[in-house]
């Protein structure tokens, strides 16, 4: 195949215009037959209001007699080159016999993709998920948003699909992976029902509504491959002798302290499994604090963001615009946007009684009237006194319990202008909030320390110079966003094992990922490490 980069066309272009551009760049005869596939598509707004789409495409000629090398040479363009797609391959089995099925704790993206690769290699893992399957989980979450009645075992954080199931469903990642794992993740989502556009969009997005369907289809496939799923069941203990795993113990409403004998356990816990973190710490796992960030969800009218980013009022051909903003200050604080949701909702994503935490969520169509993003301030171990590996967890809990008190269990909100003036908000400004979960006006001042709060205000002011209106007085703040990433890391060696033989920390909760795709990739890497070491010899 031939790859062409940097094909630039107006956003209003037709499919025929793209085809003509390919013919021109390859200097082909108009009668030469070929097919093409879009590899990457991104919006170029650097000359707004003139907007362009930039493409990379893979071209295959109908007539194999035409030499691709000769065509590339004739094109005489650095954007035209020979292309060979990287095909992902599962590694060969190792030599150590594994006669007991591996256990995966957690059915988020890390756990699901670890199970997917292990199943394809014949390992038939047992997946233990503390929350419910996605069909029941969706009902539990909706009930919580409508009534405020929380199910601590099945909520926005816990359940099949992980926390990302109730998010924007962004699939972009900064992970550079030459082995084809990133492509495999996207292709797998498409295989189970996602829009094929995620394979080439520069900022792929699946949406919480579509992602739920994809997860169900993926689970059904894995069950057919011999994977066992156990829902509403928590891994509550590990039997460890001489630094080696012997058994996993689980707890559920119907069966407490049930034993599963195994030599391999993947800890794909997610970032909110605080009781499990406690258990692992007390069991002697090597763990450490790590930096993370906290802040508030900030809402603006989506139309305002579109006009700033596109330079024109958005037309029907353009999707709701995302944004990404960052700043750094002399005090060492970074302030930046996180999990930006165009056309999205602020959601109550609490998972613990008497704690309130928020996140952002979008459906596939991104059709709400507001844009929202977490605007967060960096937190380092020095902010919470890192006397042990769980200090960051305790800091999160402190913020969430105080946040709960401010809103009396509802999402506390304050307009940015009132936040700056340390004043209680009494009414929305020119636009109202788009939320899933009930809200109340409350003061958010003092939740963060003075240095962090000042950094947040300065960050908002700076972002107002980048996006007109970002620091408008009626921007809506919702408190608090505390679970941007895991506050700890469970250490592992080059073979992905912890200091306990047979236990593999994995994904976001273990401190090795940040988002759906990077967590899925880490799950694949851990599965590969297990496959390279063992061969399945169980019945």
Tell me the role of every PLM-derived stretch.
Residues 1-53, 57-166, 170-539:
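Residues forming the flavin
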